[in-house]
Amino acid sequence: MNKDAQMKAVINQKLIETGERERLKELLRAKLIECGWRDQLKAHCKDVINEKGVEHVTVDDLVAEITPKGRALVPDSVKKELLQRIRAFLAQHASL
C-alpha cells in the first residue's frame, strides 16, 4: 500500500471512529435535499426510464447514466461546506 492510500485509510478510520463520517454524510444528505438535488435526480431517472422503456433499463444502466449528471448537479456551495468541515476535522486531528 502506497503512502497516499495509507494516509487515506488512517483518515477514513478516524472519521469512522469519531462518528464524523456519519455526521458528514447526514449533512450532505440534508443539503442535497434542501437544494432540490434529489428531486432533480429523481426526475432525470424517470425521464431515462420513460425514454428507454422500463423493460429495457437495468439498475446498472440507470446508475451509469445518472452518476455523471448527479455529480455535476451538486452545488458548489455544498461541496465547499463539506470540504470546509473535512479540513476543520483534519486540523483538529493534525496528529494523523
UniProtKB/Swiss-Prot annotation:
The keyword Transcription applies. One of its GO terms (molecular function) is chromatin binding. Belongs to the ENY2 family. It is found in: Nucleus, Nucleoplasm. InterPro entries: TF_ENY2, TF_EnY2_sf. The keyword Transcription regulation applies. GO terms for biological process: chromatin organization; poly(A)+ mRNA export from nucleus; positive regulation of DNA-templated transcription; protein transport; regulation of transcription by RNA polymerase II; transcription elongation by RNA polymerase II. This is Transcription and mRNA export factor ENY2. It holds the Pfam family EnY2. Signal peptide: none annotated. Involved in mRNA export coupled transcription activation by association with both the TREX-2 and the SAGA complexes. The transcription regulatory histone acetylation (HAT) complex SAGA is a multiprotein complex that activates transcription by remodeling chromatin and mediating histone acetylation and deubiquitination. Within the SAGA complex, participates in a subcomplex that specifically deubiquitinates histones. The SAGA complex is recruited to specific gene promoters by activators, where it is required for transcription. One of its GO terms (cellular component) is DUBm complex. Keywords: Activator, Chromatin regulator, mRNA transport, Nucleus, Protein transport, Transcription, Transcription regulation, Translocation, Transport. Component of the nuclear pore complex (NPC)-associated TREX-2 complex (transcription and export complex 2). Component of the SAGA transcription coactivator-HAT complex. Within the SAGA complex, participates in a subcomplex of SAGA called the DUB module (deubiquitination module).
